Amino acid sequence: MIRRELRASLIAVVVLTAVFGFAYPAVMTGFAEVAFHHQANGSLITKNGKVVGSELAAQSFAKPQYFHERPSATTPPYNPGATTFSNLGPTSDALKKQVQAAIAQILKTEGPYNPGLTVHEIPVDAVTTSGSGIDPDISPAYAALQARRVAAVRHMSLGEVKKLISQNTDGRSLGFFGEPGVNVLELNLALDRHAA
């Protein structure tokens, strides 16, 4: 009797492992490759046939002719292999110092192009990290704050830059989830294409 139960248990383990450990993942992977090829392969963005990044992960743009991303919570910064959130609460002194440093940097970087810029005009996403620590999107408000700098450095009209921001702004998911966002990598690539 014990032998029969042991045999049935072993057969169940082998069958369930084969079905849920091999067959089901293979079918789902195949379906994803066919139906969602771009997403299944990391939502990669290419330039001149070379992969330059992903729609899903931020990367650093420090040069003034590019739009800048929001702060990163990963170590080293913008490391997609170490996505994390800061876990700092609103009463945290460390968070206050990070935000104050980010505000000072924004005022230094954007202030000369936006005379009279005040702390209250700086969007929250310009000085805080995202939940993943490497969010590729910024708010349209943060993009608009940077538009004058990018236009001046690239010798473009402000209208041209704002048009590129608008063209690279994604709406809410399904029309009502989340907030509109601007993918920084895609916007910067659009700027490079415009200059070419």
Describe the predicted segments one by one.
Residues 1-19:
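Membrane-entry signal-anchor segments at the cytosolic-membrane interface
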Residues 12, 20-21, 26-146, 153, ...:
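Flexible, solvent-exposed loop/hinge segments and secondary-structure transition points
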Residues 144-196:
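Extracytoplasmic/periplasmic C-terminal soluble domains
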